[in-house]
Each structure stands twice: as structure tokens, then as C-alpha cells.
From Swiss-Prot:
The lineage of its organism: Eukaryota, Viridiplantae, Streptophyta, Embryophyta, Tracheophyta. InterPro entries: P-loop_NTPase, Rab_GTPases_membrane_traffic, Small_GTP-bd, Small_GTPase. It is a lipid-anchor. This is Ras-related protein RABA5a. GO terms for molecular function: GTP binding; GTPase activity. The keyword Lipid metabolism does not apply.
Length: 221
């Protein structure tokens, strides 16, 4: 998968992806590591709306991932429906060293389904895998929850960058694959180049066939 800078040619697709999960699980550092290869060990909770973009190439098509951070709103249980609007992918993040953040996953998943399409491609992310001596949630527990909910799964470390790019790429690739299958199966569009559908506009995938995004898949750290 190739990456591009913001100055390169306009993208074929724009996918909105949201980061959700309890405060201080490392969402902002995951985004910083993926988008800018940076890490802030003493970072405070995000304040204000923030999103970053990253371009990548999949099968010769240029994809721009527009990745949104909750901007600290989760501390006040005030993540709004506008945050989720138009999202086609999500990273649902917990901290492997804080079991309570794992227990909150069900609430975040319900909120995601309430405010967005049920078919949003979602990966469950156990962050801070570098904190091995402080681990409170086992890899097996994370995998089991992901399998039960039909989610992808991966453990990451924003500190040492383990699996960070892979987690985002998993979501983007699955969104693209699903969109490509929909284009190929459409009688009206089967002779067109899939890139002609979006050409730089946000992609919102129709919600027919609710199980289509639920391609349970697991990757451990």
C-alpha cells in the first residue's frame, strides 16, 4: 500500500473514519502516529474538533482517509450525531491496561450503531500493547469480543507504532473492497470505472444487506 502527501493528485475516494472509545485510551496518539508518525507521551485529552487525512493507494486507486478524533467530548458523554454522520469506518479503541475501558466497548458500539449506518466497517483496537506488565485485558478476551460482534481485531501500540498502520489499513481496504463489490454487482454501473462514482466526494455506502460489513476477522499483536 503506497502513501501520498497532501500535495499529490486528487483522490478517487474519500472515506470518513471515526475514532471512538473512552478518554485517555490513546486515540489521539494513534491518529498522530498514523498520520504524522508522531507520539506525545504527555499529551492531554484532545480539546476541539480534530481530524487528519492520509492518502493511500489500493489497487491503483487513490484513497483519502479522513480520520476524526472525538476531541475530548467523550469525557462529557457528549459525542454528537454530527461526529458520526457520513462515517463508513470506525476504530473502537480500549486500553489493555484499563479493564474499565474494555467494559465500555458495548456502549460505544451501541452509540456507533445509533448514529451511523449499521454497516460501518469497524475494528476493535486494544491499544497500549507495550504495557505488558500492566495488562488487564488479555488478547484472547479482545478477540472473543470482536468475534462475537463481527468486528475486526488488532492490538496496537502508538508508542512503538506496532500495528498502527495495519489497523487503519484494514478498515480502509475493507471499505474499498465492499464498495468495489457493490459497483461490480450493479447493473447500471457495471461498465463504468468505479472511480467515477466518487471522484473526491465522501463515500456513503448504501445499507442494503446489513451483514455485509460484518466480516469477522482477527489479527493479534
Amino acid at each position: 500500500m503506497a502513501f501520498y502527501s497532501e500535495d499529490d493528485k486528487s483522490e478517487d475516494y474519500l472515506f470518513k473514519i471515526v475514532l471512538i472509545g473512552d478518554s485517555a485510551v490513546g486515540k489521539s496518539n494513534l491518529l498522530a502516529r498514523f498520520a504524522r508518525d508522531e507520539f506525545y507521551p504527555n499529551s492531554k485529552s484532545t480539546i476541539g474538533v480534530e481530524f487528519q487525512t492520509q492518502k493511500m493507494d489500493i489497487n491503483g486507486k487513490e484513497i483519502k482517509a479522513q480520520i476524526w478524533d472525538t476531541a475530548g467530548q467523550e469525557r462529557f458523554r457528549a459525542v454528537t450525531s454530527a461526529y458520526y454522520r457520513g462515517a463508513v469506518g470506525a476504530l473502537l479503541v480500549y486500553d489493555i491496561s484499563r479493564r474499565q475501558t474494555f467494559h465500555s466497548i458495548g456502549r460505544w458500539l451501541n452509540e456507533l450503531h445509533t448514529h451511523s449506518d449499521m454497516n460501518v466497517v469497524t475494528i476493535l483496537v486494544g491499544n497500549k500493547s507495550d504495557l505488558k506488565d500492566l495488562r488487564e485485558v488479555s488478547t484472547a478476551e479482545g478477540k472473543a469480543l470482536a468475534e462475537a460482534q463481527g468486528l475486526f481485531f488488532m492490538e496496537t501500540s502508538a508508542l512503538d507504532s506496532s500495528n498502527v498502520a495495519a489497523a487503519f489499513e484494514t478498515v480502509v481496504k475493507e471499505i474499498y473492497n465492499i464498495l468495489s463489490r457493490k459497483v461490480m454487482s450493479s447493473q447500471e454501473l457495471n461498465k463504468q470505472d468505479p472511480a467515477s462514482l466518487s471522484n473526491g466526494k465522501k463515500v456513503v455506502i448504501p445499507s442494503d444487506g446489513q451483514g455485509e460489513f460484518k466480516k469477522g476477522g482477527c489479527c493479534s499483536s
